Amino acid sequence: YGVSVTDINSDGKNEFIVTGFGYPNLALGYIDGKLKNIIQEDVFLDRDRKTIGVAACDIDKDGFEEIYFLNTDTYSGTKKYSDRLIDKNNNNYFDLFELKKNIENLNLTAGRSVVCVDRKGDGEYGIYVANYGGPTRFYEIENNTITDKAKTLNLDKVTGGRAVVSGHILTDRADIFAANERGANFLLKNNDGKFEDVAFDYRVDDVIQNGRGTALSDIYYRGRLDILSGNWNGYHRAYVLENNEFKDIGNKAFDRPSRIRTIISADFDNDGFDEVFMNNIAEPNKLFKINENGKFEEIKLKTALETQGFGTGAAVADIDNDGILELLVSHGESKAQPLTLYKAKVEKNNKYLRIKPINKFGAPARGA
């Protein structure tokens, strides 16, 4: 189902973390030219739970990224199995939510997506859980105990949460954009660590659409993040901020409705311009290049079309460390399907520079 990227075994190399949704969760490392699962511990594999979403960040400030697994065994409302927050001690993995002191803050509401947020800009992360049919959660660790801070931070909203991203959208702190179903989107402006929903004011509420995939991208290449938002069988959006409101500048080909599930924005071919990959379910995927001045150019895919693919998630990483990003697409939902892994054909003259910001605890500075 969902996919994230982290260095789970602290060997200096990234792994793809893939949720199983009734099948084992995977930690896929690049070994001898192949992707291989490197973790076999039951608490991580979690075969009996319907794991749908995943995010990684250092929530306990020890320099190692914990893994948040979002479980959903019902469509909406109360669920049977709670989420997991996987930590490591001497190469043994365990679930922080299973500790007695953390049980009162279990998330027992169905959800879809999860994202890490450095709300104070100090490297101390919280985890935003986009729930469906119940209040949003925002977990932090205080005094070595998991605490839900959503109500305190004005985040405990009830909606059909679908997709969520965090970054410097409006302020110099981490803001949050949440694409929702059967309700307005949220644009959560960071005000000194607390949040205010300004989606209506900035014209990104998109209330009649049903959000699915979303990503942040510098569409105008001007040094600020814009919003890519995909709607289920609805018009997709390329929101750029102009005169204190967002405008959709996507062309007809980009905006055209589809059964979208995931949006990825990255420079796949190392030419200095970002591409946007749209993963659709049971219809062809699409790829666009963002040229100068935010002009979207559709690139006709020969591979990665997946016309009969039941895509549910995707992520990018230079998993083999050759300077070219790999794209991993996960599948599932109504039908079990294998993972797919893609790489662009890159011109020899194209160059790359990879930067990995580190915070004061020695962990990846996500959202920097």
Predicted stretch roles:
Residues 23, 50-55, 81, 110-112, ...:
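Beta-rich catalytic cores
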Residues 38-49, 96-108, 149-159, 198-208, ...:
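Short loop/turn motifs that recur once per blade in beta-propeller domains
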Residues 1-10, 50-61, 111-121, 161-175, ...:
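Beta-propeller blade termini
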Residues 17-18, 44-45, 73-79, 105, ...:
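Short consensus segments that form the blades of beta-propeller domains
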Residues 10-19, 61-70, 121-130, 171-179, ...:
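Acidic/hydrophobic-patterned starts of short beta strands in beta-sheet-rich repeat architectures
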Residues 145, 242-246, 295-311, 320-368:
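Gly/Ser/Thr/Pro-enriched helix-cap/hinge segments flanking short amphipathic alpha-helices
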Residues 24-38, 79-98, 135-149, 184-198, ...:
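Beta-propeller blade repeat segments, especially FG-GAP/WD-type strand-to-loop junctions
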Residues 48-53, 72, 78-119, 152-155:
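Asp-box/WD-like beta-propeller blade repeats and closely related beta-sheet repeat scaffolds
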